[in-house]
Each structure stands twice: as C-alpha cells, then as structure tokens.
Amino acid sequence: MALHIDYYVSLNSPWTYLGAQRIEDYAAKYGATLRVFPVDFGTIFPASGGFPLPKRSPQRRAYRTMELQRWRDALGIPINLEPKHFPSSEALSSSCVIALRETAGDNVAVEVAHRVLKAVWEEDLNPGDPEVLGRLIRTCDLDPKAVLALAADPQWEERRTTDTQAALDRGVFGAPSYMIGDEIFWGQDRLGFVEKRLARG
C-alpha cells in the first residue's frame, strides 16, 4: 500500500533545501504522496523550546555553518553559506504554496516551495519581493499573476496558522520534518531512515 508523507518546511531553511531533491526522489521511487506544509517556525520555535538563528549562541551558529559546508560538499549542492536575502519574508511565498496545494495539488505546491528555497540558497534572490516571486512562479510553468492573486486571499494565512498548530500538536519542532503516519523524522540527515520506512510499505 502506498504511503503518505506530510512534509513540514520552512521556506528559509537550508536544511529543507539540502533534502529537497531527495524527498521528491524517494516519494516517486516508492509511490508515496508528498504533501507540503510551509508552517510558521517563528511560532513553533518558542512553543517547543527552540531558538531562531540570531538568538543561538556563537558556538551553535559556528557549528551550523560548518555542518552546512560539510553537507554542501557531500551532496554537491552549491548553496551559498551566507545568502544575501536570508531570512526572506515567508508570508507571501507560503500563501502561494498553500493556495496551490489546496487548489492545484501537492506536486505543484512542492515544486514551487523548492523553487523558492533554491532562489534563496543558490541564486541570492529575495522571494519576499512579489516581483521576484512572480518570476520564480513563472519558471514553474504557472501564471504568476493568477497565483499571486489567488494567494492574496486571507484564507491561506489563516490556513497556515491552522497548519502550524497542527504541526505542534503532532510533535513538529524543526525543519524539515517528514511524517509518515505518527512517525516523525526530523532533518534531512534522517532521510535514510525515511527511505527505509517507505521501503517497508
């Protein structure tokens, strides 16, 4: 029986981006559905004992940079360790992803979410700028005016708030988190365990 993955992301997270292609590949390989939730980690971190990057100790920030470089080199993904527009505003891009998820389906929503992450971490672009976001949407073979108009509906911001609380209720505390049933896998470095779980069916 095909499995379903609930995929909790931050559209600013380098770790989400480092795992982006692999989670798509694993879902395709094992015939799993992949549903993306761009939740608000500004709400999740304080509610779960975490800290946003600027509030972490210098030691933790330095180690994060070292780990990003290790994973960049190991995976061959050319991320910029100090992107110009990090963190970018996630509000509009999240509304676009949620609106597409609910109206056009999971695959296109995942595609746009991953396109936004690539813009931040490889291309030094600012998806918080509506003009830039529109160009990114166009590269996904979508009409940017139509998507941005759809995303302007406040129901998508409300849905993000609901999704964020649901993530907390399920035990999510970091990005990316992959949930298969009630089992949570936190971090792109756990994707090997995700694949094993998918292989079991």
Predicted regions, residues:
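C-terminal cap of thioredoxin/glutaredoxin-like
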Residues: 3-6, 12-32, 111, 115-201
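Structural alpha/beta surface segment adjacent to cysteine/selenocysteine redox centers
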Residues: 11, 17-120
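A structural signal for the main folded, soluble domain(s) of proteins
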Residues: 1-4, 84
